[in-house]
């Protein structure tokens, strides 16, 4: 079995592998979020402001909308629990707004 660096990191830290991860990326113009199953290596659900809005949309309100849409899509596909992968970002501002909006919609993080 080929393991990527995210799987190896979770094994080393003793964290469960049965949950997909919610990966968040913020550019200057847009916010991107996707739920990834690292054991299979596939993106299960994705949402971003790039697909919904034109122009510069990287505010906290836009992050909340992305979190809501991502959670709705995930629950439709039967995904109820995820692990938050915020990368190098602090849990503050847009990252926090996206995560809390996803929690309000029923996704367990």
UniProtKB/Swiss-Prot annotation:
SUPFAM superfamilies on file: Translational machinery components
GO MF annotation terms: 5S rRNA binding; structural constituent of ribosome
Positions of disulphide bridges: none
GO biological process, one term: translation
InterPro entries in alphabetical order: Ribosomal_uL18_bac-type, Ribosomal_uL18_bac/euk
CDD domains listed in its UniProt record: Ribosomal_L18_L5e
Main location: plastid
Annotated GO CC locations: chloroplast; ribonucleoprotein complex; ribosome
Keywords assigned by UniProt, alphabetized: Chloroplast, Plastid, Ribonucleoprotein, Ribosomal protein, RNA-binding, rRNA-binding
Compartmental location: Plastid, Chloroplast
UniProt similarity note: Belongs to the universal ribosomal protein uL18 family.
Biological function: Binds 5S rRNA, forms part of the central protuberance of the 50S subunit.
Self-association and partners: Part of the 50S ribosomal subunit; contacts the 5S rRNA.
Name of the molecule in the record: Large ribosomal subunit protein uL18c
């Amino acid at each position: 079995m080929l393991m990527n660096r995210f799987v190896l990191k979770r094994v080393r830290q003793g964290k469960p592998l049965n949950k997909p991860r919610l990966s968040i990326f913020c550019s200057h113009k847009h916010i991107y979020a996707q739920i990834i199953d690292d054991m299979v290596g596939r993106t299960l659900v994705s949402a971003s402001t790039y697909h919904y809005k034109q122009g510069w949309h990287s505010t906290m309100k836009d992050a909340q909308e992305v979190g809501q849409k991502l959670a709705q899509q995930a629950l439709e596909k039967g995904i109820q629990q995820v692990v938050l992968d915020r990368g190098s970002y602090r849990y503050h501002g847009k990252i926090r707004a996206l995560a809390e909006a996803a929690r309000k919609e029923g996704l367990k993080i």
